[in-house]
């Protein structure tokens, strides 16, 4: 969980680079070329148009020739020394079951956007591709990933068994299915995590079963808490913040419609695309951040420090941090920080949006030589506890030990943690189906029951399943990202003298950069999509 939240910030920071890369003219000869795939071909020009070829019912244009095949699977993280050991263990299974092998390829946190882009536009073999919600439009427009609809229909037995039908259909642009959603914590809400000892010292109660403080339900409540804690501990900083990691990153009372340039307010219950930065809700949030800043709740380097939120928490000098809340979020962060923590939901109920469901999906790259076998391997992983445990946790006795074998609860082997383990690195959320793998202590398998309850009761954005095609807006989105980078952190930490004046300056710059064109195009595409769903814009 900790790594997923770090990853979200990395994606946001890389958005501008990804927009530039995906719009750099790679949809020319490469896109028009036919890629030979065993006994069949796939035309990437039709992919760029967001259209799949017509096929006879019950058939698929991709046919598996059953020859030995090695699937290169990219993932995003820190390269670990025991990767080959994990591959060998997985391949003992895959060679027997599918006459296939898996070759894992790590893309580092700081370079994954650029490195994956280079692999897809070049000649590198990259069969299974981690596709981010922000990079998907460029990949589809440039034909860098395949349309998976036929492949899922034909070979996706486990995918259709484990993945919610709405989630299968969600990663699409104009009907082009570009990825498969991993079964992790798709449901999310934004909140705050705090030092439990200081919270209880201030007179608040924490639910031991959920690790949540139900007395704190708003920014106003949190402001009151921080005032009490600061009075007792003036030497401490109340709220963590960093460059590209201010609290505004986690204010999420809207459906961002991929990039946040034109959103649906009221948690996606409105279908009118509006400028977030002109809303009264955004203004009120920034005003609160200004009050926090003036009260000394942020550190003096809140918008310049490159020290991660996790590293700040581990110093013991900070009280709280904004974060994305998921089932088991508090216990995961307790493991990494070695502190007793408590959470609070201060921005409303759990919400399902295309952004949350499509945050990371698994696509198939255009250079894949055998899409059918690749999909078979991907589908097998979705249904194999053995392979998923190897991907998530490694090898028993080497990387993990059982705490409760009957319940499938594991922990690091003695003397190891996330920094010293040769493999176990907290990336279960990223791999295809974490739900069928073991559970890391102190969580229990009941975590997944809670997860499904949240999904069943969550507010679903009226645009869930909609992803807009931004291929005609690359220049505008690049300019908008540059403008946002100039203002976002100062607004997000309240580091402004006059909220109204800075917001006006920010909005003027956004409109000059082309925001209205983006909003209009999003609204047009959303209205067309809603018409196919039996809904109309409000």
Specify the residue positions occupied by each region the protein language model found.
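Bacterial Sec-dependent N-terminal signal peptides
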Residues: 1-10
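Extracytoplasmic/secretory soluble proteins
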Residues: 9-10, 15, 19-538
């Amino acid at each position: 969980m900790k790594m997923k939240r770090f990853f979200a910030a990395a994606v946001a920071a890389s958005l501008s680079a990804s927009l530039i890369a995906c719009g750099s003219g790679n949809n020319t000869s490469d896109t028009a070329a036919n890629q030979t795939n065993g006994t069949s071909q796939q035309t990437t020009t039709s992919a760029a148009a967001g259209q799949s070829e017509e096929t006879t019912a019950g058939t698929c244009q991709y046919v598996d020739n059953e020859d030995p095949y090695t699937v290169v699977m990219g993932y995003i993280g820190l390269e670990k020394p025991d990767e080959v050991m994990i591959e060998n263990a997985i391949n003992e299974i895959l060679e027997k079951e599918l006459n296939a092998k898996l070759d894992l390829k790590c893309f580092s946190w700081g370079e994954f956007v650029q490195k994956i882009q280079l692999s897809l536009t070049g000649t590198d073999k990259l069969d299974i591709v981690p596709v981010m919600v922000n990079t998907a439009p460029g990949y589809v427009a440039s034909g860098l990933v395949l349309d998976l609809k036929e492949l899922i229909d034909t070979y996706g037995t486990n995918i259709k068994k484990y993945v919610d039908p709405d989630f299968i259909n969600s990663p699409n642009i104009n009907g082009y299915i570009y990825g498969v959603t991993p079964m992790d914590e798709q449901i999310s809400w934004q909140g705050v995590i705090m030092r439990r000892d200081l919270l209880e010292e201030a007179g608040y109660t924490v639910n031991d079963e959920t690790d949540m403080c139900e007395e704190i339900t708003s920014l106003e409540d949190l402001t009151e808490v921080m005032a009490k804690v600061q009075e007792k501990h003036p030497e401490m900083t109340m709220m963590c913040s960093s460059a590209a990691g201010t609290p505004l990153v986690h204010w999420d009372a809207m459906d961002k419609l991929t990039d946040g340039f034109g959103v649906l307010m009221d948690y996606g219950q409105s279908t009118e695309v509006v400028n977030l930065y002109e809303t009264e809700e955004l203004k009120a949030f920034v005003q609160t951040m200004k009050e926090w800043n003036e009260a000394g709740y942020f550190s003096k380097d809140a918008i310049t420090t490159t020290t991660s939120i996790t590293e700040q928490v581990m110093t013991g000098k900070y009280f709280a941090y904004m974060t994305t809340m998921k089932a088991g979020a508090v216990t995961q962060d307790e493991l990494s920080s070695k502190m007793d923590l408590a959470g609070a939901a201060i921005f409303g109920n759990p919400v399902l949006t295309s952004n949350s469901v499509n945050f990371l999906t698994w696509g198939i790259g255009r250079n894949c030589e055998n899409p059918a076998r690749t999909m078979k391997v991907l589908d097998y992983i979705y249904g194999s506890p053995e392979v998923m445990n190897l991907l998530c946790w490694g090898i028993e006795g080497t990387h993990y030990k059982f705490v409760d074998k009957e319940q499938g609860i594991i922990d690091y082997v003695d003397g190891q943690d996330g920094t010293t383990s040769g493999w176990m690195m907290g990336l279960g959320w990223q791999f295809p189906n974490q739900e069928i793998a073991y559970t890391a202590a102190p969580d229990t398998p009941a975590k997944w029951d809670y997860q499904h309850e949240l999904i069943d009761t969550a507010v679903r954005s009226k645009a869930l399943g909609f992803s807009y095609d931004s291929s005609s807006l690359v220049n505008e989105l690049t300019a908008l990202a540059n403008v946002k980078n100039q203002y976002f952190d100062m607004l997000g930490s309240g580091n402004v003298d006059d909220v109204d004046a800075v917001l006006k300056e920010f909005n003027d710059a956004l409109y000059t950069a082309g925001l209205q064109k983006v909003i209009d195009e999003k609204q047009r595409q959303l209205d067309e999509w809603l018409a196919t769903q039996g809904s109309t814009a409000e």
